[in-house]
Design a protein with these regions (language model features):
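Helix-loop-helix
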Residues: 47-54, 147-161, 231-305, 309-310
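Pre-NBD coupling/linker segments of ABC/ABC-like ATPases
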Residues: 314-330
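Transmembrane helices of ABC transporter permease
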Residues: 10, 14-27, 38, 62, ...
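An intracellular "coupling" helix at the cytosolic face of ABC transporter transmembrane type-1 domains
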Residues: 10-13, 98-102, 118-131, 135, ...
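Membrane-integrated ABC transporters
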Residues: 1-31, 36, 44-60, 65, ...
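ABC-type nucleotide-binding domain
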Residues: 326-579
Length: 579
């Protein structure tokens, strides 16, 4: 928890003042029963109206000052809690940005979203309540007991018996429910994960008429969550009736002892009223304390989940700077794989095995294979989204591990299978490639990506709004814009991971021709299911079940690689790929 507590350093003053003002408010509250006892014992008994008015004025003054202290405490506690959660959320988001794909895959997107949102909100609520009540409630409980001794020692012993019994109930419930809240939160993660998966793949679900099975899956997970929450709720609900039973029995005992003391002249009727008021104050504060414990238990469970993310160290280390001279040999290797293997964390079988090839600068490399053959796994090693578990990967003549993150990602641009655009404008999305790019550079990239025509057709051109995820654009438009975004950065290696799947054959061919015509020595990796898209590549890597079963040009592979021949034949058998 040390990492999380450091985010409270900027709010130490507020974190100290909030409980202090609450204690000050509680001090004024403790004097109220004594003033009321005086009104009954002196004012009412003597029919002294002036005395009653003066004491009522004192009660009003205590209420006003107490209210001022309470509002001040609320302000400081809210400022500390909101500021703390804001700082923690920023730190968590920044930490997540440093995590590698392996850590992201292990934890899951839905879990990270939950910890960024509801978990931190729960921590904020718990901290806010804690700062206001963690001193006030115990202070009132102990203070009321001490004040009871100033009224009548014999009656005050009832407080001494009641308070420990109440504490056992309150803390017993806390000990039982705290681990259960963690389990409930884990089940909530499961429900959120299923919801996200269903909404993301809603078209597939409906295409296969799987609505009923998805509903059943969701209901099963939701039922487990509901049962756990009900179980926790049932245990927590015992707190109020048990505490009320103890308090009411204590009040009955108090009235009984009070009646005896009044008969023998040991105390007045106003003193009994004061003692009952003190007992009621204890009841109110213990109910608050019980609620505080429940909220803090939830907050601690959520804080532990947030801390687990913060404790997760990135699996990849990037050097701060590139050591030695940058290689400028234009005839050298752009990418070299030497007996590379890759096994994902938690996977039983390797995704890639013994992959070796060399891509020269300026070459176009095709990657093809069946579903699950390891195409995306292979190209993910080039920008170092994952580290090879066997062998070495060299980029531009150096091991990938020697590059700083910015230098490597600046040299290697990746266009993913799923085109991802961000809310803003076409211009703001393109500037992700190079924030200092001029309009001429943006249009040049759009021309190469075959996107210039439809962007010009937009009323605002480059400043045309883009909705979150590019919802207002077609699949082909999104793919072309993501390719243009990659080209704006003028990388030395461009990876197109099946990123032209939504393009027609004519546009796909025009794109490949435009890429080949780019000046310089751009090395292009094209991952595609279409053999036609790779026919003119300098080399084609053929993968099957994580192994490289073919390497060469199109014509050679048709003669030497049965897997490639089968893929090609399946697409051209009916001639639909060329018509």
């Amino acid at each position: 928890m040390n990492k999380m507590l450091t985010h409270l350093n900027g709010y130490k003053r507020e974190a100290v003042l909030a409980p202090l003002f609450k204690m000050l408010e509680a001090t004024f509250d403790l004097f109220v029963p004594l003033v009321m006892a005086d009104i009954v014992n002196v004012g009412i008994a003597a029919h002294d109206f002036h005395y009653i008015l003066v004491r009522c004025g004192i009660l009003l003054l205590l209420a006003v000052v107490g209210l001022a202290c309470s509002l001040t405490a609320q302000y400081f506690s809210a400022k500390a809690a909101v500021g703390y959660s804001t700082s923690l959320r920023h730190a968590l988001f920044e930490h997540i940005q440093r995590l590698g794909f392996t850590e992201m895959d292990t934890m899951g997107t839905s879990t990270l979203i939950t910890r960024m949102t509801s978990d931190i909100n729960q921590v904020q609520s718990g901290l806010n309540l804690f700062l206001r009540l963690f001193l006030r409630s115990p202070f009132v409980v102990v203070g009321a007991m001490i004040m009871a001794f100033t009224v009548n020692v014999r009656a005050a012993w009832i407080f001494v018996v009641a308070i420990p019994l109440l504490s056992v109930v309150v803390f017993g419930v806390m000990v039982i429910t705290n681990p259960l809240y963690k389990t409930a939160q884990a089940r909530l993660d499961r429900v959120l994960g299923l919801t996200r998966e269903n909404l993301t793949g809603v078209r597939v679900v409906r295409a296969f008429d799987k609505e009923k099975s998805e509903i059943d899956r969701f209901e099963s997970a939701n039922d487990l969550l509901t049962r756990m929450q009900l179980h926790v709720g049932h245990i927590s609900s015992l707190m109020s009736p048990l505490t009320y039973v103890i308090i009411n029995l204590a009040i009955v005992a108090l009235l009984y002892v009070g009646s005896i003391e009044i008969n023998v002249g040991g105390m007045a009727s106003g003193d009994v009223i004061a003692l009952v008021n003190y007992m009621n104050q204890i009841l109110v504060e213990l109910v608050k304390l019980a609620n505080l414990i429940v909220q803090v238990s939830k907050a601690l469970a959520c804080a532990g989940r947030v801390q687990a993310v913060l404790d997760t160290e990135p699996g990849m280390e990037f050097p701060a700077a590139l050591k030695g001279e940058v290689l400028t040999d234009k005839a050298g290797d752009a990418v070299r794989f030497d007996h590379v293997g890759l096994t994902y964390a938690g996977a039983g079988a390797p995704s890639l095995t013994d992959i070796s090839f060399t891509a020269k600068r300026g070459q176009t490399i095709g990657v093809i294979g069946g579903t699950g053959s390891g195409k995306s796994s292979l190209i993910n090693l080039i920008p170092r989204f994952y580290d090879a578990t066997e062998g070495t990967v060299e980029i531009l003549g150096r091991p990938a591990q020697e590059y700083p993150r910015a230098a490597l990602r600046g040299s290697v641009a990746v266009v993913m299978q799923k085109a991802q655009l961000f809310g803003g404008t076409i211009r703001s999305n393109l500037l992700w490639g190079n924030k200092n790019a001029a309009d001429a550079d943006l249009w040049a990239a759009l021309e190469t990506a075959q996107a210039a025509d439809f962007v010009r057709a937009k009323p605002l051109g480059l400043d045309e709004p883009v909705e979150q995820g590019g919802r207002n654009l077609s699949g082909g438009q999104k793919q072309r814009l993501t390719i243009a975004r990659a080209l704006v950065g003028k990388p030395e290696i461009l990876i197109l991971d099946d990123s032209a799947s939504a393009l027609d054959y004519a546009t796909d061919a025009a794109l490949r021709k435009a890429l080949a015509a780019l000046p310089g020595d751009l090395t292009v990796f094209i991952v595609s299911q279409r053999a036609a898209s790779l026919q003119h590549a300098d080399q084609i890597i053929v993968l099957d079940d994580g192994r490289m079963v073919g390497l060469g040009r199109h014509a050679d592979l048709l003669k030497t690689c049965p897997v490639y021949e089968e893929i090609y034949a399946s697409q051209f058998k009916k001639g639909d790929a060329q018509k």
